[in-house]
Amino acid sequence: MLITKRKFFSLLKFRSIIKKCFFISSFVLVGALLFSGEFYKPETHVRPDNPNIEYIGRFDFSRRGIVRFDWPGVQIKTHFSGTYCAIKLKDGYNNYNIFIDGKLHKVLRTTSDTLYTLAENLNDREHTLLITKRTEARKDLVSFRGFNLNAGDSLLPVIKEKKRKIEFIGDSFFTGLGSEGKTPDCVFNRDNENCYIAFGPVLARKLNADYSIIAISGIGVVRNDGDPNLTSKRTMPYFYERTCMNDTLKWDFQKWQPDLVVVRLGNNDYWGKPYPTLHAFQTEYIKFLKRIRKLYSKASILVLCEPVKKDQHCNYISDVVNELKTESGDKKIWFEKLNVNLDKTKDFGCQEHPNESGHKKIAAALEPIIRKAMNW
């Protein structure tokens, strides 16, 4: 096929235009990426099994390259060098406090399986990182896949402090439900729940203790809040020995032996009708406390009750502890009925649950009781 001179030069001109368009498009694209911050930057990935990561609480390490969890208040600690740190999480249901160098840096609200920036543009030096789970167990487990740092940066050894250990077992008062709510009639959601400011963690920090929280809103000993039946199938004794609430893997109790166990259960059993029978309630409560004692042979156990609507259940619980002490001779278990005067206008968040001010008052009332009993 013959090409005329005119067609030949037209083709050359067309080719030149295409090259220019491609060059301009490439330049614009690269510029856009640079200014948007999406341009590729070399990063160092740190696996979750790195020895410089400290885990506090119940975590599932059974899967390679993934650490799973869901209980409220679990903590991940590390030190890192550099200006930037991100976390790989598969999670769309939870919120986390991100502390950098001991100060609250941000609240992370997860939405999907992705890489979340925790901090950037920091001073180029060593930093401490503490992540605390604000929210209680949701629909599924969280999968932690590690950290990303700038290329050349790394995690640094964590100096593990020799702290006391406390385990808190209970309900929404330990999860911090509604603790950041503005009024008692506000509706609970994940954004106003902050386990970190609930009285258990506040108390633990006062006592220089690490803590583990096994708590579920609405949970009971024999009957959960809102159940139309006299008994519920999935109460705290059902979930207690799990590594994660939403998985059946059993927890290895030898991994973490607390000095003190604080149990606050029973309010939900008697929050609304139909009430469980006294025999069923006390029998199951004694059975559960015996399980705790078997798992933690050396720990002290504080069984706590503070009146919410009615305090009759507190008498039932006191009788449980007295019967157990008489039967077994256990001198390291005791009962406390805690009366704290909370101001209805200042000390309550959502759904008649304490806010930060209310939780601080409860922790302040408990601190001298525990210090005296534990000789702390």
Language-model features, listed with the residues they occupy:
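Conserved SGNH/GDSL esterase-like catalytic core that processes O-acyl groups on lipids
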Residues: 71-74, 137-141, 179, 185-276, ...
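Extracellular serine-dependent O-acyl
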Residues: 301-350, 358-376
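Sec-exported extracytoplasmic/periplasmic mature domains
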Residues: 174, 208, 212, 266, ...
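Surface-exposed acidic, glycine-flexible loop patches that form ligand/cofactor-binding
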Residues: 156-159, 248-257, 290-296, 373-376
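Glycoside hydrolase catalytic-domain groove-lining segments
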Residues: 276-301
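N-terminal secretory targeting modules
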Residues: 3-4, 9, 18, 23, ...
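Proline-centered flexible-loop/turn and helix-kink motifs
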Residues: 92, 297-298, 329
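Structural recognition of the beta-strand scaffold that forms the well-ordered cores
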Residues: 165-169, 174, 211-215, 259-264, ...
